[in-house]
């Protein structure tokens, strides 16, 4: 099964231009591939509801960091629900 790459997600969501920023930010904060994918999907949802009015890159940085944290929480919650103690 051929899964989409991280680049594919950024291309489909229209954020390919900020991929280097996203990777650097995620690496500095210690997030993994799965959390990045979940976060970019959440960023795209927010972009569709509340697009930036001025500085798209600054907006992306702020929202992506927020969504990375949400993604980690969602993934941990899913794993906890899947594997109860």
Say what each PLM segment does:
Residues 1-69, 76-85:
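Append "and, occasionally, other polyanion-binding protein interfaces
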């Amino acid at each position: 099964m051929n899964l989409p790459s991280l680049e594919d997600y950024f291309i489909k969501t229209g954020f390919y231009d900020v991929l280097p920023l996203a990777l650097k930010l995620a690496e500095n904060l210690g997030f993994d591939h799965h959390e990045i994918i979940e976060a970019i999907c959440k960023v795209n949802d927010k972009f569709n509801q509340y697009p930036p009015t001025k500085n798209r890159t600054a907006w992306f940085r702020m929202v992506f960091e927020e969504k990375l944290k949400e993604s980690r929480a969602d993934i941990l919650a899913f794993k906890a629900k899947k594997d109860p103690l």
